[in-house]
């Protein structure tokens, strides 16, 4: 049995772990490897999110942990997602106690409405609140999700053959970031409530995304198409667009049980872990919005790993990738004892970091804890 170190939130002295084995003792027996207790690490990282970023006066998460109280709509959706991750993993009401406060604060900060100019931002909030509804059965979350879904569907037009636009007033710009999450949302709404129209929306959005913004040979997801010019931006390839395309394929696979969807997800995942990395670790995509990109990929990559019909050799390869990234972040990229993460998972951020970068790190550590709990990661 492997020994595990418990990482406590109040840890004072940084601890370091070695992936390699120690020298074999004189008696010829190898010492046991020391491994990370991902459950404890996730507790530490997710509580840090609350302790260092939560704005108790406004009931939302601040932009950084250094006093910038600027409200950002879409990162707050992912902060709720992390709280739900932690609550589902532990059952600890210390996490769920923030759900209602988040609901009140985020809506108030967004002008006392869930409506927003950016369709992708509304999609992220709808996805997070759909999860909140599932774990609480509180209908206010369901009502908010359905309200948002109504706004989101208004973003579809026939420019560039279909797709949901990125931003109100920019009907010509059709982006992967506004269609991947929308397809996931539509599919999950169908699975939750059984509305056939939602299933058709999921098929339609996914079909447009795959045929328009995905390289069929490599699985790379292109960023956007300008319907005024017909030009596709093939230079911008980001981990979060890869992730939401993977996520939408997995959700449709769950509905139809057709392996073709799983194959789509695998192709996109293989491209990501082969091309958007540095030495097998997801590369930095900067701060600000980019700080969240890797965490979004990790969330939907984890969903793919959990699929029972995923070929065993592929699953093992993906688990090795996850383990390497999580160990690298925890051992090389985490400021201890504060448990802070930066955009580069091989580099500690110091004492200050942004909400988006912290969220991506939290998502990775929570994913490792989930996979460990399911006895997939060892």
What are these regions (language model features)?
Residues 1-17:
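Sec-dependent bacterial lipoprotein signal peptides
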Residues 186-189, 198-249:
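Active-site cradle of extracellular carbohydrate-active enzymes
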Residues 241-256, 260-277:
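Oxyanion-binding "anion nests"
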Residues 13-40, 44:
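Bacterial Sec-dependent N-terminal signal peptides
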Residues 48, 85, 105, 131, ...:
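Alpha-helical scaffold segments in carbohydrate-active enzymes
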Residues 33-80, 86-120, 132, 136, ...:
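CBM-like carbohydrate-recognition segments
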């Amino acid at each position: 049995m492997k020994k595990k170190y418990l990482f406590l939130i109040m840890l004072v002295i940084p601890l370091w772990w070695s992936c390699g084995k120690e020298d074999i003792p004189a008696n010829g027996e190898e010492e046991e490897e020391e491994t990370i207790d991902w459950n404890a690490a996730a507790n530490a990282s997710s509580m840090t999110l609350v302790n260092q970023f939560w704005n108790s006066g406004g009931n939302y998460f601040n932009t950084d942990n250094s006093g910038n109280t600027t409200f950002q709509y879409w990162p707050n959706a992912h902060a709720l997602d992390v709280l739900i991750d932690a609550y589902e993993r532990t059952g600890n009401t210390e996490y769920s106690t923030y759900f209602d406060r988040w609901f009140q604060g985020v809506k108030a900060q967004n002008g006392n409405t869930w409506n927003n100019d950016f369709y992708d931002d509304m999609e992220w909030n709808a996805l997070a609140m759909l999860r909140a509804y599932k774990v609480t059965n509180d209908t206010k979350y369901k009502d908010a999700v359905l309200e948002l879904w109504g706004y989101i569907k208004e973003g579809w037009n026939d420019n560039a053959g279909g797709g949901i636009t990125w931003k109100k007033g920019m009907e010509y710009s059709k982006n992967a970031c506004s269609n991947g999450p929308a397809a996931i949302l539509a599919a999950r709404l169908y699975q939750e409530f059984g509305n056939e129209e939602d299933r058709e929306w999921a098929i339609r959005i996914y079909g447009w995304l795959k045929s328009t913004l995905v390289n069929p040979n490599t699985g790379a997801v292109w960023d956007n198409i300008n319907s005024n010019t017909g030009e596709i931006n093939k230079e911008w390839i980001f981990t979060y667009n890869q992730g939401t395309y993977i996520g939408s394929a997995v959700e449709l696979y769950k509905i139809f049980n057709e392996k073709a969807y799983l194959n789509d997800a695998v192709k996109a995942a293989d491209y990501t872990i082969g091309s958007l990395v540095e030495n097998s670790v997801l590369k930095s995509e900067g701060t600000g919005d980019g700080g969240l990109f890797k965490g979004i990929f990790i969330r939907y990559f984890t969903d793919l790993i959990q699929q029972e019909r995923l070929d065993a050799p592929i699953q093992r390869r993906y688990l090795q990738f996850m383990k390497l990234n999580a160990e690298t972040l925890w051992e090389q990229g985490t400021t201890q004892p504060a448990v802070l993460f930066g955009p580069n998972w091989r580099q500690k951020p110091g004492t200050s970091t942004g909400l988006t970068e912290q969220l991506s790190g939290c998502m990775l550590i929570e994913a490792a804890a989930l996979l460990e709990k399911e006895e997939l990661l060892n």
